[in-house]
Curated annotation (Swiss-Prot):
Coiled-coil zones: none
Domain called DHFR: residue spans: 4-165
Name of the protein this chain belongs to: Dihydrofolate reductase
Domain of life: Bacteria
Gene behind the chain: dhfR
Family recorded in the similarity comment: Belongs to the dihydrofolate reductase family.
Entry-linked InterPro entries: DHFR, DHFR-like_dom_sf, DHFR_CS, DHFR_dom
GO cellular component: cytosol
Catalysed reaction equations from the record: (6S)-5,6,7,8-tetrahydrofolate + NADP(+) = 7,8-dihydrofolate + NADPH + H(+)
UniProt xrefs under SUPFAM superfamilies: Dihydrofolate reductase-like
Record: residues binding substrate: I8, W9, A10, E30, R61, T119
Amino acid sequence: MTKKIVAIWAQDEEGVIGKENRLPWHLPAELQHFKETTLNHAILMGRVTFDGMGRRLLPKRETLILTRNPEEKIDGVATFQDVQSVLDWYQAQEKNLYIIGGKQIFQAFEPYLDEVIVTHIHARVEGDTYFPEELDLSLFETVSSKFYAKDEKNPYDFTIQYRKRKEV
């Protein structure tokens, strides 16, 4: 297996990715996809995103936090203060690294991304955090996508799009 750095996120039609440091929707099928994709790999997020998840660890995933606070110590979590230290850690690994947010973390890792996995929620929801416009998705070509219709458990239609970085 060739390891890779992948950004994975969900957004609504306006680019909303969060509200009050949480996901502003509940889509069990999308959460299941996230789980299956990231299982047995490493996930990286900012400390604010980790706080928004209630500081709970996701099972069978190595959790990495990027924080400005060098004193931040969290049981079961590897903490880093800068992008380069995360990249140095990654070089010694055999697993994928999934960048799961928030906005500043996506921006910081854009130059290093091999792939992106975007869930496009076909609705507009209320939110206060938007996916960074600075991240240039034109650098990535769509390789596949899968549509999910809303149902009794998932209140919105959504499409999961898989993109890989274009060859230069």
